Amino acid sequence: MKKLSILILFLMSLSLAPTISSAATACPSIVNWDGVELKSGQIGRVLIQKPTTIYKNVNGTFEFSRVAQPGENYRVYANKSTYYHLGGGLIIQESSSILYQTPSKQKLDCAKSAPTTLTIGNTESSVKSKLGTSQNSVLNEFGTTTSIYHKNYSNFYAISLLNNKIASLYTKDKHYQVNGISITNTISQLESKLGKNYETTGNTYPIEVITYQLPKYEANFFIDVHNDNKISAILLVDYQLINKNPNLYPKPSSTLEASYETLLFELVNAERKVQGVSVLQNSSKIAAVAKKHSADMGKNNYFNHDNLKGESPFDRLANGGVQFRNAGENIAMGYTNPYFAHEALMNSLGHRKNIVSTAYTQLGVGAHFAKWTYGSIPYYTENFIKP
């Protein structure tokens, strides 16, 4: 965001680890399947024939959610073993009580390529229609709620509402489109659509964030300097929402710290999904180690992987009771929200390697706000491990 240009921002990382196709028919903007929209990522549907149980996946355990009744239909986003995944963590088991159907290949291909065109000012109902039910919700720096949407971390969105309308939107969905701009477009393509009257964040070159002050909202386009300077993510923020927090940094609270930790964890897994590697499990034990280091750096005014006692990340993990074969750590400070922190980490090769490494299976994130001249500055720590 605009105010980031005057911040002091730091990043450090440490680790210990080993076709072109064409469509025969033009696709409509909304793909209908028997009168109902076929969502991007949807692979089929289940029709309920007899009462049957729907489960919710809670940390790998299937818990009772509700009983689906005859006549109800549910979208299916994945078919694994004998279970159909309905989105939102909901699961239904294959049985004679349900009928599974799939659309034509043409409809599936069109649904995959259909752009998502949500933008600032769209209604809450349009969000639900396009994205379904949120997976999680967190507090943001403006004091409002951010809802997180994804399908097993694909098509990732984080959306905040103000007066029941979209006030901020972050996405890594390659099908998303705003003002004719999509994820993976180049800087020159961006300039051809919106012009060259923009601000940049980061060093003079390479450019890491391009910010346009549009009539109703601020549009931030994150640039991946390690992928031919293509757009990696988009963040739109309504000026009305920005004005709810005129200060350089948000008012700190334990709730906001926990929210930043949750969002940063979600961003890492969304990134891993984009990069084609398996997502990480959240570990509260590892997160406690990360949290302690962020707090220690903030309270004692230093920024380093080794703390003032000379303990390395690996020492701290061991002291925290974490057993590991591989481990890595990313730290950052000064970024007013997790979006900018994550995208900056991805533009640093050492941090990027930790985030997308197949050597890790678990992640713990810790955030802390420390007193500073302009308010409270956030410190972030990500600890990656493989037991």
Segments and roles (model prediction):
Residues 111-117, 174-181, 249-259, 273-283, ...:
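Second-shell loop/turn segments in exported
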Residues 161-163, 168-219, 313-387:
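A well-ordered secondary-structure block
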Residues 256-315, 361-363:
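Short, well-ordered surface patches within globular domains
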Residues 92-95, 105-107, 139-179, 209-252, ...:
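Amphipathic N-proximal alpha-helical interface segments
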Residues 1-24:
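Sec-dependent N-terminal signal peptides of Gram-positive bacterial secreted proteins and lipoproteins
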Residues 24-106:
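Beta-loop motif signature
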Residues 60-83, 113-126, 130-139, 180-187, ...:
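Extracytoplasmic Gram-positive cell-surface binding/anchoring modules and repeats
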Residues 108-114, 119-162, 188-229, 358, ...:
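A cross-family detector of function-defining hotspots
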